[in-house]
Amino acid sequence: MKPTFRFFCLLVVLAMGAVGCHRTPDEVLIRQAIDAAALATDQVDASALAERLTGDFDGNGGAMSRQDIGNLLRMASFRGETLHAVLGPVDIEPHGERYVANFTVTLTSGGKWLPEQLGIYKVETAWRRDGRDWRCYGATWTQQF
């Protein structure tokens, strides 16, 4: 083998190794989980939304559990309701091995069972790693308008 060909092969192997070692940053994974939760809401898919929450999820200081949120979406689905969640900018901050994400969300519905204008909410979510995934273990929200 010619030295230039060997050098080229070495560069290819090193480049492939570097790509294989690349790990998606936690902030990106959390942002993707938030987007997936919004999509699950748009699709009125209770199981897809619950998948993003931990079993011990605490919503608004005990007001809603993971099961409560799932039941709300199931009820909306059974009644043929449409939901829409439009996210505002998401700000993610590390807190040790966990993260806090703050954002606004505008919720609307088709108006069959729920009011058409559900409101604009300021949301703070807390995230922790669960295996390879990031799951929300707590959230607080306040209606803005």
Please give the residue ranges for each predicted region:
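Bacterial N-terminal signal peptides that target proteins for export
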Residues: 1-9
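Extracytoplasmic/periplasmic/luminal assembly and interaction segments
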Residues: 58-84
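Second-shell loop/turn segments in exported
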Residues: 38, 55-61, 112
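C-terminal motif of bacterial Sec signal peptides marking the signal peptidase cleavage site
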Residues: 17-20
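Short, well-ordered alpha-helical segments enriched in acidic and aromatic residues
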Residues: 43-56, 60
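Short, low-complexity, disordered segments immediately C-terminal to signal peptides
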Residues: 26-37
